[in-house]
UniProtKB/Swiss-Prot annotation:
Domain PilZ residue range list: 133-246
HAMAP family noted in UniProt: YcgR (MF_01457)
Organism annotation: Paraburkholderia phytofirmans (strain DSM 17436 / LMG 22146 / PsJN) (Burkholderia phytofirmans)
Protein name, entry field: Flagellar brake protein YcgR 1
Biased composition (Polar residues): 1-18
Amino acid sequence: MDTTQSNGQTDTQGQLHAQTAEGGNDFGRRNPLEIGVQLRNLVNRGDFLTVQYAGGQLVTRLLEVDVRGRTFTFDWGALSDQNRGLLGAPRCQFHAQPDGVRVEFATATPRETRFEGLPAFEADFPEVLFYVQRREYFRVDAPILDPYVCSGRLPEGDTFRFEVHDLSLGGVGMRTADERVAELPMGTRLLDCELVLGALGRLSLDLQLVSHRSTALPNGTQRYQLGFRFLTLPGSAENTLQRLITQLEMKRRSLVR
């Protein structure tokens, strides 16, 4: 997996406990069965997670969940230094953002194991798993007919044009059959992207890749779904997106009545 270095470690539980105290809502899952369900959802969807530890971080995927044993297995990193660092870390923080929901939890030191003949990590269930769906993560599907599009340049300078799948105040989901995205590392930043939103006009925004999935179509081609978060969202852009999200949600509700 692709890795990046970090000088510190986020106190995830402290941040989310503070949010709980302020908002009056407890986002924590403490029942091992509930924790197992959330971890299995990450396995089934193939979502990427970022694991932060003292001195670094790596991007991984969950491979298997053992609810009875209260353990889970996750993918080995690409760099031996990161793997050694993680095996020696007293505490590991996991972060994921599947479908606009923030999933975060912490574990003690993981162990080296094998999964399908290959090296992997195994860790005990966390004591608490935070599952947070906040206002900025509420997503609505974009129109299929006359779809919205996002265009810009990939890190190498090549242009792209992807179809918008869904929207929130926190980011945008896109889909494409463009094979160039298969090798985009997590955390990739795409700057000055143009989001074309039909009658509401255009927005110029900086994006960062936070999720990446591929699906094989019946004809054998791959379809890629990409999730990006907005690095910054100016007030005018937020107002435009909020109006659009409200309109799309009202239209959706009118169709299901």
